[in-house]
Amino acid sequence: MTSFKTIASLLLIILLVHILALINYWYWTYQWLDIPMHFLGGFWAAMAIIFLISNFQFPIQKEFLNQNFLRFTIVILSFVIFIGVFLEFVEFLYDIFISSRGYSGFLQLGAADTIADLFFDLLGAFVFIFIYRIQERFKKV
């Protein structure tokens, strides 16, 4: 499930939908579109981080993946939230330098939107973690 091909394919799908959404103003027409995009982003980030750990022992040792569920979940969610917060800053800077000059609509709709974005990032990551752990359990059987 965490092959490079799967990770790259999901990233390309997310980027394609995101680019189409920006070009066609879907984020402003269909405000709900932001929810599945953040969910998929969190799902992808968790997938990518677990792939990096299991294949390159980056940024932590591979043995970590087999430790207790709570510790594993907290560390993976921490990496995902770091990426999510970084992307919220990117949205903020986009609004300052691009949207404020009239080139596009605003991406930051306020604190509630930011919190919802981060929540769905984490939810997507948690769903992937759950699927990953179930898959790993069945491999051991």
Where in this protein do the model-derived segments appear?
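Bulky hydrophobic segments
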Residues: 1-112, 122-141
